[in-house]
Structures are given as C-alpha cells and as structure tokens.
C-alpha cells in the first residue's frame, strides 16, 4: 500500500527506488534477527515507463534565451533545429556546400531520406526564417559546417558531435531556473515541437514531409532529373 501511493501518483521511478530502499532495510533486519522474512520480496518492482516532458514553445523560448550565455554556435543550432525540424545528427551534419538552388539539401542519417528545404521557409510564430539563420551561421562558423566551433584537436574538420547539442541543451535548461519533471525535455524534443508548429501553420502533410515521414505518393514531388532523389518541399 505504501508503494501504491507513489504508483498511483505516476511516480513509478520513485516507487522503484523506495522499494529498493525498503528491501535493503528489511534484509538488514533479518540479519539482525528482528524479522524472519522480507515483506518486500513478494511485491513486484513497478514498471518504469520513461515519458519525456513535452517541449512547449514558451519553454523553448526560455531555454533559447538562456542559450545566449553559451558558445555562439549552440543557440544557432537550436534555431536551425526548430526551423528545419531535423534530428541532432542531421543538424550537426549540415554544410554550406549542401546549399544550392536556394535550398538546403539534407540527407537524413537515420532514414536516408533526402529532402531539399527552401531557404525561404519560415516559422513566424518563432520568428525564424531558414535563410536568415543560415546567414547568421556564416558569421560564426569557421568551416563548411553550419554549426561549428572551429578546428579542434578532437574535431579536425570543425564539426560538432550530436551529443554536444544534448549537453549544451541541458546546460541552457538549467540556466532557466525552471523546475522540470523527472524527465525534462531534451534537444531532440525541438524536432517534435517543430512538427507541431508546422502542422498548425502549414498543415499536417507539409509537417510530415519536412520531418521525413513520407509516403510513396508524396515522394513523387521531386526537384528535377539531376536531383530527383531529393524530396521537394
């Protein structure tokens, strides 16, 4: 019944921790001869389902503002992630040489999906336009990568490891002083936020295509013969 109070409150992780603590306490009591059986043994460990806290635009804006305290490339990475809706590994792999015909060409590392995002793409509710974000990246980057901290010993080409985005996001999140749940939003949640915002402003079909979730029907929309493998947005 004691553990049920935590489980009913949706705090399965805490319930699991308390079960472990109680089991250790009763095990010590058995050793000392105070009791003969461990009452925790018959109980089942609560199933822990990690539910990531959804990132909302208001919270994103707070984290984005706090990100200005970090290296200049990171807030740009946040803007790029929100305006393009791409994954961490795709954000860190974007290059200036992949920009031509007024589009940013992206080959998603996870799925192999190839999309061409127009530089004119904008997300008014967030005050972002892809072309503007790209130009700001040019002012900061020292190489071909849009997001770069420059040539370093552990990065001779100037690229940023995807985990670097995750770590900097955690730092910015802490700078906000906001109290989050046990499973606070991560950098990856920016992609989900982008999907929801584009769904509201441009429709579900566009949002799905931007994220790379396409059907055979939508893949018929290509650029030209030379770039027919890229999905035109």
Residue ranges of predicted features:
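N-terminal core-binding DNA-recognition domain of tyrosine site-specific recombinases/integrases
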Residues: 1-27, 32-34, 72, 158-164, ...
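Basic, Lys/Arg- and aromatic-enriched nucleic-acid-binding interface segment
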Residues: 9-20, 31, 35, 41-88, ...
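Proline-centered turn/helix-capping motifs that create local helix->coil transitions or kinks
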Residues: 30-38, 135-140
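C-terminal catalytic core of Y-nucleophile DNA break-rejoin enzymes
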Residues: 49, 111-135, 142-171
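Catalytic-site neighborhood detector that most strongly recognizes the C-terminal catalytic loop/helix
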Residues: 54, 108-112, 204, 211-233
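Short, basic (Lys/Arg/His-rich) helix/loop patches that form interaction surfaces
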Residues: 68-70, 74, 84, 140-142, ...
